A protein has these predicted regions:
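Oxyanion-binding and handling regions
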Residues: 1-24, 37, 92-201
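Short, conserved micro-motifs enriched in small and acidic residues
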Residues: 34-35, 70-74, 164
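DPxDG-like acidic metal-binding loop motif
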Residues: 60-96
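Short glycine/serine- and small hydrophobic-enriched flexible loop segments
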Residues: 45-46, 81, 171-175
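N-terminal phosphate-binding loop and adjacent alpha-helix
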Residues: 32-49
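Phosphate/pyrophosphate-binding loops at sites that engage ATP/ADP/AMP, CoA/4′-phosphopantetheine
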Residues: 44-60
């Protein structure tokens, strides 16, 4: 696919920005110090200066839309929407858990993302595919299962760590370009999954 994609991941403490051309990584900047508001614009600027690719040449902006940190989601999506509007480009919204799942070879497992305190967003996979809906629980509920997720310095031995990255966002964007792309950026909303939503079911 002959496309240039700017990819952004800000749903955890990691701020990750990358530029891909024809599915190949051109540049990547990442920082894990939760400085999204000060680094996101800087990373994007550096990418286009270093790559010598005009920002108007990109075909789309891929962005992780949650679940994840409320602050990180707001910063990332607001930036992506503003940039997309200014250069008249579409956005490719990507579910955070879907991006974390990118590259896992196991077939039956649980994928987790820390929400707050002892609680996690949890998605079960069977035969390599999503099984059921995302649910909200403590890690103890799946302690004896195969578990993947972003540990973010949490001392939880049962989790096989996977770092969020804009590289994974871009790979999914290429795979699902025609199905995921959204030209009307007003329709794109952050995926704020809250505990109360699970309790209503």
């Amino acid at each position: 696919m002959n496309k240039i994609i700017l990819s952004i991941e800000t749903t955890t403490n990691i701020c990750s920005v990358s530029l891909f051309q024809n599915k190949k990584l051109i540049y990547l900047f990442e920082d894990n110090n939760r400085k999204h508001s000060s680094l996101l614009g800087l990373f994007v600027e550096k990418i286009f200066i270093n790559s010598e690719i005009p920002i108007q040449s990109i075909d789309a902006i891929a962005i992780s839309i949650g679940p994840g940190s409320y602050t990180g989601l707001r910063i990332g999506l607001s930036f992506a929407k503003g940039l997309a509007f200014s250069i008249n480009k579409p956005i490719i919204p990507i579910n955070t858990l879907e991006s974390l799942n990118e590259g896992i070879k196991d077939l039956n497992y649980f994928l987790v993302l820390h929400a707050f305190k002892d609680n996690f967003f949890i998605q079960e996979y069977k035969n390599g595919k999503e099984y059921g809906d995302i649910f909200f629980n403590t890690i103890e509920s799946i302690i004896n299962k195969k578990v993947y997720g972003y540990k973010n310095n949490l001392l939880i031995n049962c989790i096989n760590n996977i770092n969020p990255s804009s590289k994974k966002i871009a790979r999914i964007a290429y795979k699902n370009y025609d199905n995921y792309i959204e030209n009307d950026i007003k329709l794109i909303k952050p995926n704020y999954i809250k505990p109360i939503e699970f309790n209503k079911k």
